[in-house]
């Protein structure tokens, strides 16, 4: 094996990234080295690429980007006895301490000392990558790599959709970006009906329909609240799933959900959002869930089972596939323009 490899690196504290040759790492204690078979772009990667306020406060260049991955284990470090060379894995990207109050109460997804690879350490946008053995998830050998790399973001969607009953429930989804599209797929696979999607991008509305949305609405051209009320005979939806992080969409969703309904929030908002909490939440007795990370490891079992069931319509969501990283800038700019679903890299061109 060569000693060097290409990797997408955040080389400096500024917009963009670079494709550079870096050393192939060696696994340390408790780590495994994987040959990256597929890796996909997340919204977090886009924030790092754009060098927004959050990225500036968290990222310390130079650093290899990326955290969604599927790969084959080719070397194990000292002390690793749960993962073997040849295993086909994906990875939970939240490295938890196991010692804090949250972890000791089995709430690992909100560990108070969470570290994330591709954020707090080198990531997986490379031909080879290090994964902590405790974070490795063994995949079925017949799962396509482009599906296996999506399990981490699918976990976000699963926790959002399945935070409460969904089968047979009328559902509004705001935002049909990559995570919203995964949310549509999970909602449909779980029996939600009708699934109504509010999304301003025509490209993404068309993707939403391909994934299985029963109704789509452009909130810039129609009132989505009236749209929902017309469909539900004035009752409102039983479930509101927020993926956009847009304050206006959030408010419209609260208006559209029926009293006593359920709200799950995954989209990240500006720090301050103003809305009528008394009339839109308290007096409506809404059940509100904030969603972050994935429950370890319950969510992963659910995600893997959903994929293996064949009920998840993932193919329309994967809109762009690249062999190698040569066109990574094109991929990021397309994502910035809202002209993609999920983007998947296959690092090894052969």
UniProtKB/Swiss-Prot annotation:
Cleavable signal peptide: none
The EC number(s) this enzyme carries: 1.1.1.103
Family note: Belongs to the zinc-containing alcohol dehydrogenase family.
Single Gene Ontology BP annotation: L-threonine catabolic process to glycine
Keywords: Cytoplasm, Metal-binding, NAD, Oxidoreductase, Zinc
Catalytic reaction(s) noted: L-threonine + NAD(+) = (2S)-2-amino-3-oxobutanoate + NADH + H(+)
Its job: Catalyzes the NAD(+)-dependent oxidation of L-threonine to 2-amino-3-ketobutyrate.
GO CC terms, sorted: cytoplasm
Subcellular location per the Swiss-Prot or TrEMBL entry: Cytoplasm
Active-site residues, record numbering mapped to chain: 44 (charge relay system), 47 (charge relay system)
Domain of life: Archaea
Source organism per UniProt: Thermococcus onnurineus (strain NA1)
GO MF term set: adenyl nucleotide binding; anion binding; L-threonine 3-dehydrogenase activity; zinc ion binding
Name of the protein this chain belongs to: L-threonine 3-dehydrogenase
């Amino acid at each position: 094996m060569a000693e060097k490899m290409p990797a997408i690196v955040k080389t400096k504290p500024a917009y963009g990234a670079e494709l550079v040759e870096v050393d192939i790492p060696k696994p340390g204690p408790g780590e495994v080295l994987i040959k990256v078979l597929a890796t996909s772009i997340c919204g977090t990667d886009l924030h790092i690429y754009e060098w927004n306020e959050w990225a500036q406060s968290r990222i310390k260049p130079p650093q290899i980007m990326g955290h969604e991955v599927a790969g084959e284990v080719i070397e194990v470090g000292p002390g690793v006895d749960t993962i073997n060379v040849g295993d086909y894995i994906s990875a939970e990207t939240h490295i938890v301490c196991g010692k804090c109050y949250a972890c000791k109460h089995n709430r690992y997804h909100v560990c108070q000392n969470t570290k994330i690879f591709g954020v707090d350490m080198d990531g997986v946008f490379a031909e080879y990558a290090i994964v902590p053995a405790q974070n490795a998830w063994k995949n079925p050998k017949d799962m396509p790599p482009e599906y296996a790399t999506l399990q981490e973001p699918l976990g976000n969607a699963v926790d959002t959709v399945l935070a409460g009953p969904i089968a047979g429930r009328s559902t509004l989804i705001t935002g049909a970006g990559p995570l919203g599209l995964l949310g549509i797929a999970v909602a449909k696979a779980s029996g939600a009906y009708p699934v109504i999607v509010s999304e301003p991008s025509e490209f993404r509305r068309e993707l939403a329909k391909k994934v299985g949305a029963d109704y789509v609405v452009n909130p810039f051209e129609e009132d989505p609240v009236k749209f929902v009320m017309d469909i539900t005979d004035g009752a409102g939806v039983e479930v509101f799933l927020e993926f956009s992080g847009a304050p206006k969409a959030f408010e419209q969703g609260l208006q559209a959900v029926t009293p006593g309904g359920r709200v799950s929030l995954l989209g990240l908002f500006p720090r301050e959002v103003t809305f009528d909490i008394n009339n839109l939440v308290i007096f409506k007795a809404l059940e509100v869930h904030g969603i972050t990370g994935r429950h370890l490891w319950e969510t992963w079992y659910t995600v893997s089972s959903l994929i293996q069931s064949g009920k998840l319509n993932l193919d329309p969501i994967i809109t762009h596939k690249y062999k190698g990283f040569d066109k990574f800038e094109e991929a990021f700019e397309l994502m910035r323009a809202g002209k993609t679903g999920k983007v998947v890299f296959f690092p090894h061109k052969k």
